Amino acid sequence: MLDDRKFSEQELVRRNKYKNLVDQNKDPYKITNWKRNTTLLKLNEKYKDYSKEELLNLTQELVIVAGRIKLYREAGKKAAFVNIDDQDSSIQLYVRLDEIGQEAFEDFRDLDLGDIIGVKGNMMRTDHGELSIRCKEVVLLSKALRPLPDKHAGIQDIEEKYRRRYVDLIMNHDVRKTFQARTKIIRTMQNFLDNRGYMEVETPILHSLKGGASAKPFVTHYNVLNTDVYLRIATELHLKRLIVGGFEGVYEIGRIFRNEGMSTRHNPEFTSIELYVAYEDMFFLMDLTEEIFRVCNSAVNSSSVIEYNNVKIDLSKPFKRLHMVDGIKQVTGVDFWQEMTVEQALELAKKHNVYVEKHQESVGHIINLFYEEFVESTIVEPTFVYGHPKEISPLAKSNPNDPRFTDRFELFIIGREYANAFSELNDPIDQYERFKAQLEEESKGNDEANDMDIDFVEALEHAMPPTAGIGIGIDRLVMLLTNCDSIKDVLLFPQMKPKE
């Protein structure tokens, strides 16, 4: 119950100040707007080179700005300095009793850190050389009834930082910059693909079948149809239907939902882009992916050399290309190019202490387990790892020279996957058989196996051209380009465990 809320002494003081304002018919919450004519960033840029004397002699227009009080210090009984922040910058205010009047100055001295104020005034520079606004009018626009954390200590509890992101954003300019960079990265990617003639589309979030990726879905219920449906684990199968329908380049940036673990790299709800281009293959996508990473980096960083987890990466260099089997051979000496039986592969797994679940008892699965166990963490420079086994790639085209493997790649940087791409399987007969194999895996306990999507098979039976498709994790890309350790640092409101 709201009546049971307990307030600290400082919160009670603030509430009492607000009550006094209401009693004086000065309720700030009734103010509907404050028309600014500039921003703090623009002021700082415009006047950064003006001296104190130049500003005194300058014929100035009145500046009208707004911001949140972050610092307050009195200069005697008749003046005070205040620092305010807006979205992109901060500035100092100089407020004098003889310039704003007795009543307004008394109201001003009752303000608290965190209050949002509107200001009118002229630009000046203090004796210490700090660019400031000499205030002619100060108006309380919104009263902060809760105090901010200590300016220097900030939010100490990392969980609270994510739960109360609004406070984190108030206190930390760098956090705001990270999310502004995220928006720039997404917009840059959209512009890049739009300029190549590819079309951004929207496909359903609620799916009647699970498919397009190997993942556990969230299940919900459609009341009007009285049936369970899944939140999408990928956008792939709908986008490929559009290629069948005649579009030659489509992409979607959107939320994906996977009912799996949470970690510094995983959030159950995340953002990805999937792109499909007709008449191209995975090698085309390798080149395109390099371009995407470079153009997105240029949008938010001044150098092609970025630092992530204390490792420097040069995105201007060509990305390496490594066959999965070659990578395993280089690290472990095991040669999976040799034809072998499942029994022989299981013996190798046992020898190298690689755990194999029941549904993974195939040569292809064991190859992938070796890669994940021994190779993945050794990759530092951007590397396209390609040639995934057919068993773990139910939607990728088989390699024509060695059908045990597929024309598929994943991009790894510093041991993390950033992209997954195929030369798409467009053979409806092969696709039907692979869906059947997925059902067999499900019967052996693989709860990430795809359903049989007969409608998708029928779509392929109308003929899909040779097609290249890729998925890129937006959140991980933003982490890389902004040097953030945790996925929670690039999600405005990450999923958190319920409070006790």
Swiss-Prot record:
Top EC class for this record: ligase
InterPro entries given in the database record: Aa-tRNA-synt_II, aa-tRNA-synth_II, aa-tRNA-synth_II/BPL/LPL, Lys-tRNA-ligase_II, Lys-tRNA-ligase_II_N, Lys-tRNA-synth_II_C, NA-bd_OB-fold, NA-bd_OB_tRNA
Pfam families attached to this UniProt entry: tRNA-synt_2 (PF00152), tRNA_anti-codon (PF01336)
Intracellular or extracellular location(s): Cytoplasm
GO biological process: lysyl-tRNA aminoacylation
Binding sites annotated in the UniProt record for Mg(2+) 1: E410, E417
Reactions accelerated catalytically: tRNA(Lys) + L-lysine + ATP = L-lysyl-tRNA(Lys) + AMP + diphosphate
Cystine residue pairs: none
Entry similarity comment: Belongs to the class-II aminoacyl-tRNA synthetase family.
Protein's recorded name: Lysine--tRNA ligase
